[in-house]
Structure formats: C-alpha cells, structure tokens
C-alpha cells in the first residue's frame, strides 16, 4: 500500500512503517463492520497524498438500548500452511444505563510452512493475535466513543530468501527451488519479522441544534517493528532493524 493508498481506520489515518513492499497494513478486518473503497475526486476530502485511493474501515454501530449481550464466533482453515484462525466478538450495554454500550473483539491465527506445487517453503509460518475494546455513550445530543486496538503479528521469512552472496542467489534462481527442504513445521525461526501496532481513538459529537453539530476526534498510534536475520556469533536475537513510530 505504501504512500499511494490511504487507510482510514475508525476515523483515524492508519500510520505504520510503509517503506517496504512486504509490509502489509497493521489492521484486523474482523474488527470492521463496514469497509468502503473510495477512488477519484471523492478522495480529495481526505487529502492529496492518497493517489491510489482510500480504504475506509469503520466498526459496527454500538448496540445502544440492547437488553442482553450478544456475540459471534467464526473459524477459518486454509490448506496451504494448514492455517487456522478464530475470531469472536461480544457486545452489550450496562444493565442500569442502556445508553452506555461496550464491545470486545479478538482474533487469533496460526500458520505453518507454506508450499508451492512441488516443494515446501520452510520458515514461512505466521502467528497473529489481535484484539480491541470500545465503549460509547449516547444521550441524544451528546455522543462519546473510545476505541483501543492491539495488532500483533510474527511472520517467518523463508530460509532461502536470505542469501550470503550474489553468486549464491544466482545459483538458487538457476535451480528454481531451494537446495534443502525440511518437513512441515509450525515453528518460526530466524529470520522473521515481528510487528505490534497499538491505537487509541477518542470521538465526541455534540448536536447544538440551530448552532450546528460539533465534532472532535483525536488518536494515538504506536508502531513497533523488529526484523531479525540469521547472524553470526549467535546474535540472531538482536534485531537487524528495530523501528518505533509514534503519532498523534
């Protein structure tokens, strides 16, 4: 996505470290109730930096007035990498104040080595743990919302992708496959990438009648990315790249 596609997540610009083609947005689509893609002139309202368009992700509306909590659970399985995932959410209101609503949501995913048609891609497993909590208050004229989300993912990098020299890379390309392949495993070893993205968003909307509608929003995001490679002298546990990005 880089700097050509803008992501609006729950009303806030998604700010991650967008400097590599293998860095996907740090968002959990299961958290969203509505995803909208905007292209063309309509995207000007979000700024001039989104040349490729805008992806707007919004959480479902709060269940104000709902008497009993309700939830959902969904599971997923993928044959390539024997990936499985589970996501669930629970929402409701306070028993004594139905105009105060809350929601909790979480997703866990686990994948092992991926494969092509003829061989395994060792060390390409993934682990993901994402969760969010939100609450809202609605008095008719005044609405207040608060959202906190945590996105955590670890992704293995295929052993054959880290080459010691250009000659070795040329040899692997000529062979058309890795020299050695191990049996399937879910274990993630070096090299790998690990990212943790945290976000907190606050919104206030007040309807002043004839004076108009006033809207205020603020957000805080913190993106922690670490990339570990196979290093000599047992120093693989020291990240080759460790970047921390905070934004308000």
Residue spans for each PLM region:
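Outer-membrane beta-barrel proteins, especially TonB-dependent receptors
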Residues: 1-4, 9-248
